[in-house]
Amino acid sequence: MATKNLAEDPYEKLANAIIVQASKDYMSNLRKKKRNPGSASAEHDIKECERFFRSGWYQVLTSVDGEYLMNRLRKEALGTK
């Protein structure tokens, strides 16, 4: 009986791709807001990403804590410790 390799599961790949794209979007908008603090579009997109990372849909896609991930992404995007 063959074992299932989750790394090759197309649904797992899709879930990972969704999270990776949301992470890139979040970091990009954090940097945009840092360069231009008055950017309403960056603020809107940041809130949208944060809503996703706190959503039930996010929890279906991964077991990684959304708050933990947002904190890590913020530190990386803004160069803070």
Sequence positions of predicted segments:
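Short intrinsically disordered terminal tails
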Residues: M1, L78-K81
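N-terminal acidic leader/helix
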Residues: A2-S39
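Short, charge-rich amphipathic interface segments used for partner binding and complex assembly
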Residues: A40-L78
